[in-house]
């Protein structure tokens, strides 16, 4: 639990201003988002969305969100825009566990194979404000997140940022050296991009970061599809 009131639940987002990038998980980004939300301004509320499945939601006044309950009953995934998420005050999911993946095709496969049996979310690149709002609600609900990121410098950095940001229990999901070895491709990573791995500080990610640096190639999540579907 974060101890914050629903109106104070804010995330962070990427914003380009005067050619400077605001980190979506930085304090500066959070302050900016907080100011906009308190003013009732939703930035890019249509294209700013998150993709989720099997998550129940309640509005800030305490009434269930009928639409989300319907999607849960059908076991279908749904793309929820920021304008809807901003009205939520609470969420919950099966077994208090939320599986998060980067790749939309992996998300779709999990939703199809595990329909109605587990909650899942697709981050799909840099975290949008909508995704961060959902993470804040998940933390308040005592939900544990299991995060599977991409096996390249950008993917590892996003994974680390999300885990560090999350206020509840969190774990890296299939992010080991063994997983990378199984997923690796022939796609070369430039030296400039490999240098980004120096910013990996979480001890749990250091082994895979070092292996990616040694081999200099990216890994494809699609090659781990059976592991993701197994949900272990």
Label each region the model flagged.
Residues 99, 121, 146-148, 171-173:
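Hydrophobic/aromatic beta-strand patches that form the interior of the parallel beta-sheet core
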Residues 142-152:
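Acidic beta-strand-to-loop metal/phosphate-binding motif
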Residues 1-122, 127-140, 154, 161, ...:
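Nucleic-acid enzyme cleavage-core boundary/entry regions
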Residues 165-171:
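Structural alpha-beta junctions
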